[in-house]
UniProtKB/Swiss-Prot annotation:
Keywords: Coiled coil. This is Filament-like plant protein 4. The lineage of its organism: Eukaryota, Viridiplantae, Streptophyta, Embryophyta, Tracheophyta. It holds the Pfam family FPP. Interacts with WPP/MAF proteins. One of its GO terms (molecular function) is microtubule binding. The gene is FPP4. Residues 423-433, 693-705, 896-910, 918-943 have a biased composition (Polar residues). Residues 323-333 have a biased composition (Low complexity). It comes from Arabidopsis thaliana (Mouse-ear cress).
Length: 982
């Protein structure tokens, strides 16, 4: 609210100053500027014209008055002439004129003052009425707002208190329920924790039992795998035996054909014998006559050879017999070749030998059956050796890779290839399984020797010594092959042994192969690592002699050949064809195993690159991948594949890569004692059994529990024989125990999952309870904040109401001051009216006295008096009209500004006791305000929207002397209402 002072609240000194200023401005007739609208401006222009016309009339009247004054002066001059008579009259006339002038001046001043006071009173009354209405409206609105706000506050407070009570009751009930649930959940959690502890203990026990069961399962898996390997080997052996049976049938047919050919030759021999008998008779006669010399004996031998009884022996170095001879008497042709050495008395033995040949064929068939039975009995030993071979193939390949890396040439690997070629040529098809066993034994011994040679070759750099060692190795391998062939022969297959006796000995006694293995392994363990090669060879030969096995001589193969050269070539061709077909089938089956080996090597390369960056290992892996692709494309052989694989594994062992929990540094790969077999590429079927099953799962199946520490013959075979002797009942019992353990484990896991789900549900419930508590706390906080906001708003309303009351009191004080001022002005107005009445009475008395005094005067003088009275009346009428015009102008100016200012709701209201002021007015005030009441319609009609926009127009015309002080008051009112309207 604007704090400017009210324009009517002024002191009496200011009022007198304003009155003097009005008088001065009237005298000076300076132009005054007021704020009016356009319509009012047009009306005022018309009024100005009328005022100008009236002013012209006034000037005319003043001129007339001047003329009259001149006339009076002349009359006075005339009267002076009559001094004696006119002194009294002149004095009275002068006093009357001066009194009249003074009264006229006072009357004009009082009239102007009265006009200003009446205008101020009118404006103040209008403003008071307007303010009374505005104050009443404001008070009514404030009261209604107070009542509404109080009602709203009461309603809101009641609703919020009810809501808060309800929320508190709900939250307290919820909190009680949640506390009960928390107690229940705590009890359940305690029970669950106890049950979980028990379950954890149970799980620990179950985990221990599970670990034990897993170890047993692993053991059983290993046994099952060994059994599967046995089954696979048995299948393969059955396949080999079927092939052998086919070969034996073909051999039988060939032996029948050879027997027929032998019979034919025997008939020819009989004929030749007859001739020889005749010749013998002739010779006897000659002997009787004369003993022949050496030249004659040589001629006789040449004649016998020319007859067809030559020696059919072949060197065993070029070709060995494919059929195992049981005795030197197996082949009749060997005896036919020595006919010249026998005397003529032994010719009858040839007939018996034919019968012996047929009996020998039958005995050979029975012997093959017995050998099959002995083969079935020895399959356990053979399977153990093959399993060990499969487990140590990786290590042997790493050793071969080390030998390749340490030796400048590939003589260490050319040696097994040569052995392979010689064994394919020397081993007969009928003894395939025996020769495989013997070859595996030879591999084991040769592998240990090769590892020791690789150890000894580190410190030797002379090429001549290496050449001699390679030659010695070749001779040693040749001798070992012959030795293993003899060791694989059963005891009953000697020259004069029967089949029943051989089978009984093979069942009762330990096989010579195992004895020979034990002796050779003991010899190799007893010898130091740096021992000479010749010493190792001598010790092995002594062990072979102690075992009772004689090494075959190189010229012994000629005595064992019982077939002709054509039959040997045919048999070798048939065996090579069978082997080629077997190799082709096995290579197709080996493709999966080779791919698994390749995947394992790629896994090793990834592990190696992750552990450390080694370029040599990556190069060897790349070489292995190229060889793998070459093997798949049949560009390279499996030998190259195995060599590259051994190099990769050696490099991986040097890098000490941990593969599937088995660290490579835990196994001593350089020790010759831990080598069981050497993976020689002798037979592709054996490679399938060793490498394909070895890398069936992508990694080695060997472990520390399966490999013995000393790796000798007894410790290598006896545990395997013991573990393989599982009965079906024990196996089924173990399966049942395994199933029970799995079921118990599954039930425990299910219980654990159920408890976990319960615990998760309780945790969810706790989380929900916590979230509900948080939401309740949040809602409680929101309610408190709302209450605080309501309290603050109530406080702000109270402060506002207090401010309004203060403003009301201030307005009341101002209104009281205005009332006092109005009362003072009314008293002054009354005094002025009383003075005016007194002056009028004096004028009337003067006028009455003047005719009495001027009766004596002449008629012209009376005429002048009459004219003066008429002029005075006209002057009074003009003054009245001027006053009315000034009042209208004064009433128009504040009324326009009052219309422009709209009543504001922020105006303070008056008390009901002060509202009666507008009605309680004096009767004199009502009389005085009667002229203004006549002007109210004009003021009401003067309202226009132009004034509301505060357009200020300047008036160029000068108003009357009584128009300045109301203009100041109107400007004060306009400033007040313009600021409130803004």
């Amino acid at each position: 609210m604007d704090r400017k002072s009210w324009p009517w609240k002024k002191k009496s000194s200011e009022k007198t100053a304003t009155v003097t200023e009005v008088v001065d401005q009237e005298n000076g007739k300076k132009p005054s500027y007021i704020q009016i609208s356009f319509d009012q401006y047009t009306n005022l222009n018309g009024l100005k014209d009328e005022v100008k016309s009236y002013e012209e009339k006034v000037t005319k009247l003043e001129d007339q008055i001047k003329d009259l004054d001149l006339k009076l002066s002349t009359a006075n001059a005339d009267i002076v002439a009559k001094e004696v008579l006119v002194k009294q009259h002149s004095k009275v006339a002068e006093e009357a004129v001066t009194g009249w002038e003074k009264a006229e001046a006072e009357a004009s001043a009082l009239k102007t003052h009265l006009e200003t006071i009446t205008l101020a009173k009118l404006t103040v009354e209008d403003r008071a009425a307007h303010l009374d209405g505005a104050l009443k409206e404001c008070m009514r609105q404030i009261r209604s707002l107070k009542e509404e706000n109080e009602q709203k506050l009461h309603d809101v407070i009641a609703t919020k208190t009810n809501q808060m009570d309800n929320l508190r009751a709900e939250f307290e009930s919820r909190i009680g329920e949640y506390e009960e649930e928390l107690l229940r959940c705590g009890a359940e959690n305690d029970a669950l924790s106890r049950s979980l502890q028990e379950r954890s203990n149970m799980l620990m026990r179950i985990s221990e039992e599970k670990s034990q069961a897993e170890s047993e399962i692993e053991h059983l898996k290993n046994n099952i795998e060994s059994c599967e390997r046995e089954i696979n080997t048995l299948k393969y052996e059955t396949h080999v035996i079927t092939k052998e049976l086919e070969i034996r049938n073909e051999e039988k047919n060939m032996s029948m054909r050879s027997a027929e050919a032998a019979n034919k030759q025997h008939l020819e021999g009989v004929k030749k014998i007859a001739k020889l008998e005749a010749e013998c008779q002739r010779l006897r006669t000659l002997v009787r006559k004369k003993l022949p010399g050496p030249a004659a004996l040589a001629q006789m031998k040449m004649e016998v050879e020319s007859l067809g009884f030559g020696d059919h022996r072949q060197d065993h170095r070029q070709r060995r017999s494919p059929v195992r001879p049981s005795s030197p008497l197996m082949s009749p042709m060997s005896h036919m070749s020595q006919v010249s050495e026998f005397s003529l008395d032994n010719m009858q033995k040839f007939h018996k030998e034919n019968d012996l040949l047929t009996e020998r064929l039958l005995a050979m068939e029975e012997e093959t059956k017995m050998l099959k039975e002995a083969l079935a009995k020895r399959n356990s030993e053979l399977q153990v050796s093959r399993n060990l071979c499969a487990k140590t193939a990786n290590r042997l390949q790493t050793l071969e890779a080390q030998m390749m890396s340490k030796s400048p040439t590939k003589r260490g690997f050319e040696m097994p290839a040569e052995i392979f070629s010689r064994q394919n040529a020397s081993n007969p098809p009928s003894m395939a399984s025996m020769s495989e066993d013997g070859n595996e034994d030879a591999r084991s011994v040769a592998g240990s020797l090769m590892s020791e040679l690789s150890q000894s070759n580190k410190d030797k750099a002379n090429a001549k010594i290496k050449k001699t060692e390679s030659a010695n190795q070749l001779e040693l391998m040749d001798d070992f092959l012959e030795m293993e062939k003899l060791a694989c022969l059963p005891n009953g297959s000697n020259a004069n042994g029967s089949t029943d006796h051989s089978s009984a000995d093979s069942d009762a006694e330990i096989p010579p192969a195992t004895q020979l293995k034990k002796r050779i392994s003991n010899v190799l363990q007893s010898l130091p690592k740096d021992a000479a090669f010749e010493k190792i060879l001598a010790e092995i030969q002594c062990a072979v002699k102690d075992a009772g096995v004689k090494l075959p001589s190189k010229s012994h193969g000629a005595n064992l050949n019982g077939l002709t050269e054509e039959k040997v070539i045919a048999m070798s061709n048939e065996t090579t064809e069978e082997k080629v077909t077997i190799v082709e089938v096995i290579t197709q089956e080996l493709s999966d195993a080779l791919s698994q080996i390749y995947q394992f090597v790629t896994y090793l390369s990834k592990e190696a690159t992750a552990c450390s960056e080694n370029r040599t290992f990556s190069q060897k892996v790349q070489e292995f991948s190229t060889t793998f692709e070459g093997v798949l494309g049949k560009e390279k052989t499996l030998v190259d594949f195995l060599f590259d694989l051994s190099r990769v594994l050696v490099e991986a062992s040097e890098l000490k890569i941990d593969v599937l929990g088995f660290h490579t540094s835990t196994v001593e790969i350089h020790s010759p004692d831990c080598i069981d077999k050497v993976a020689l590429p002798e037979n592709k079927a054996l490679q399938k059994d060793s490498s394909g099953e070895h890398y069936q799962n992508g990694c080695s199946q060997s472990s520390d529990s399966e490999i013995p520490d000393d790796c000798n013959g007894t410790s290598g075979y006896e545990p395997k024989l013991a573990t393989c002797k599982f009965t079906t009942e024990e196996f089924e019992g173990l399966k049942l125990e395994k199933e029970k353990a799995e079921s118990n484990l599954a039930s425990c896991e299910a219980d654990l999952e159920a408890t976990k789900t319960k615990l998760q549900e309780t945790e969810k419930l706790l989380a929900e309870v916590k979230s509900d508590l948080e939401s309740a706390q949040k809602s409680n906080g929101m309610g408190e904040t709302q209450l605080k906001c309501m309290v603050e708003s109530y406080r702000s309303l109270e402060t506002r109401s207090s401010e309004l009351e203060i403003e009301l009191t201030s307005l009341k004080g101002k209104i009281e001051n205005l009332e006092d001022e109005l009362h003072d002005e009314k008293e002054n107005h009354r005094e002025a009216l009383a003075k005016c009445q007194e002056l009028e009475e004096q004028l009337q008395r003067n006028n009455q006295n003047c005719p009495n005094c001027s009766v004596i005067e002449d008629d012209p003088k009376s005429k002048q008096d009459n004219e003066l009275a008429a002029a005075a009346e006209k002057l009074a009428e003009c003054q009245e009209t001027i006053l009315l015009l000034g009042k209208q102008l004064k009433s128009m100016c504040p009324q326009t500004e009052q219309v422009a200012s709209s009543p504001s709701q922020e105006q303070q209201a008056l008390n009901p006791e002060e509202e009666e002021y507008a009605t309680s007015t004096n009767p004199q005030d009502s009389k005085l305000s009667s002229p203004s009441d006549k002007d109210t319609p004009s003021m009401n009609t003067m309202k226009s929207p132009v004034a509301s926009k505060h357009r200020h127009t300047k008036s160029n015309s000068s108003s009357s002397s009584s128009g300045l002080t109301p203009e100041k008051h109107s400007r004060g009112f306009s400033r007040f209402f313009s600021t409130k309207a803004k």
